[in-house]
Structure formats: structure tokens, C-alpha cells
């Protein structure tokens, strides 16, 4: 894109959302590393530590993993089996991409639904994770992340379907 062309509103919004996602991921990762390092120093230097630090670090691992999965799903950057790329003809590869993306979207939708049910149960239960932070709040990333991933893969499957239709003779 040359510098005289203007990006559309949706392209600018998408770019901003990607930057927000990246910033959240970096912030979570830095917080996780900072908390772990702080805990190590406190234990080794003062023989004391933050009581809820280990629990927070475990929760941050969950959040970093799921936000990282959201980031990876932007362009369909997931674990793939390269055998399809090597041996399938171009049209068959497009069909395989569509099937994989649609299947991924459906599975993520199911996981999002059942994780939402789980978070609702945790909300009803009222348990605390640490320092008066409720369990459900720590687990809320699960349905959110899988919903975002499902939506992205539904969009990717629509794009792949259009490519299949356009490439037909």
C-alpha cells in the first residue's frame, strides 16, 4: 500500500485491536515474569514471599496461553500438518483449508459454550482464587478467548470458501 492510499475504517480498527491484543499479551507476560522473579528474590533474600503469588502466576500462565492463542488465530497461524501442503493439488488444498478452518471454528464454539457454563457455575459458587479475587474472574478468559478464536476461524473459513468458489473452472 502506498502512502497516499488511506486505510479503511475496518482496517484501522483491526490494526488497533491487534495492537491492544499485543499490548495485553506483553503486559500479562511481563507481570507473570515480574511476579515470579519477585517471589524468588523475596524467598531467597528475606525468607518470605507473597502468599498468593504462586496462584497468580498459574492464572497468568492460563491468560498468556489463551491470549497468545487469540493472537495466533489472527491469520490462521495454528499447528498444521505440512503433508497437505506438499501433496495436495491447489484446489484440494483450498478445500482442505476450508474444512480445517470450519472444523476449528466449530470445536472452539463448543469449547467456548461449555467453558461459559463452567464460569457461570464458578460465579454461582462464589469461590475465591486469591486475595479476594473470585475464581470466575480468573477463568473468564477461557470462554472469551475461545469465542474470539471461533469467530476468527469462521471468518477464515468464509474467506477460504470464497477462494474455492472463485477458483472453480
Q: For the regions a protein language model found, what residue spans apply to each?
A:
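Alpha-helical transmembrane segments and membrane-interface helix-loop junctions
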Residues: 1-169
Amino acid at each position: 500500500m502506498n502512502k497516499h492510499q488511506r486505510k479503511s475504517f475496518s482496517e484501522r480498527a483491526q490494526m488497533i485491536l491487534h495492537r491492544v491484543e499485543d499490548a495485553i499479551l506483553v503486559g500479562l507476560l511481563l507481570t507473570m515474569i515480574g511476579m515470579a522473579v519477585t517471589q524468588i528474590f523475596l524467598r531467597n533474600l528475606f525468607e518470605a514471599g507473597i502468599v498468593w503469588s504462586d496462584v497468580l502466576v498459574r492464572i497468568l500462565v492460563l491468560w498468556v496461553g489463551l491470549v497468545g492463542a487469540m493472537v495466533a488465530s489472527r491469520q490462521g497461524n495454528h499447528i498444521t500438518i505440512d503433508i497437505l501442503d506438499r501433496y495436495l493439488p491447489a484446489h484440494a488444498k483450498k478445500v482442505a483449508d476450508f474444512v480445517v478452518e470450519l472444523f476449528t471454528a466449530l470445536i472452539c464454539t463448543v469449547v467456548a459454550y461449555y467453558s461459559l457454563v463452567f464460569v457461570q457455575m464458578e460465579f454461582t459458587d462464589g469461590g475465591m482464587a486469591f486475595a479476594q479475587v473470585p475464581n470466575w474472574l480468573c477463568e473468564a478468559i477461557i470462554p472469551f478467548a475461545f469465542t474470539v478464536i471461533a469467530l476468527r476461524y469462521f471468518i477464515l473459513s468464509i474467506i477460504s470458501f470464497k477462494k474455492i468458489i472463485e477458483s472453480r473452472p
